[in-house]
Amino acid sequence: MKIMFDQLRQTRMNMLTFLEKNKDRAFDIPTGYNNSIYWNIAHCIVTQQLLCYKLSGNDMIIDDELVDLYRKGTKPIGSTPSVIEIGKVKDLLFTALDQLEKDYNEGLFTNYSAYETSFGLTLTSIEEAISFNNIHEGIHFGYLLAMVK
């Protein structure tokens, strides 16, 4: 499983670097898209928490407000997040990942409620959830790259 966490860490480093390089358009929604660069990044954090923690019956380390703003099917609201909120999301890219790896290694995820993804896969274990989450975040990183072309 270490490789799965390493892959996710690299994807998130790439996302953070991309966000920093594109600060001036992080909240723009390009023509043909429904969401911004920032929304896609925050959405990845929320989805990881839902897939790994909520579906395993464990407490998420993010608050419900973040979930409500960035879960699947949402769109950016009218106001730009505050500097504090942006910093929190940047921090969560790695703190949420580090906590997931720690919790996995400590055997926290003993139960898992099967979940059918919109991708067409049914997840039945934490290992499958982590693997799928990597696919999901790779897709969203691809969206980020396409948004600035």
Which residue ranges define each predicted feature?
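Hydrophobic alpha-helical core bundles mediating ligand binding, dimerization, or RNAP-core interactions
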Residues: 8, 12-15, 19, 93, ...
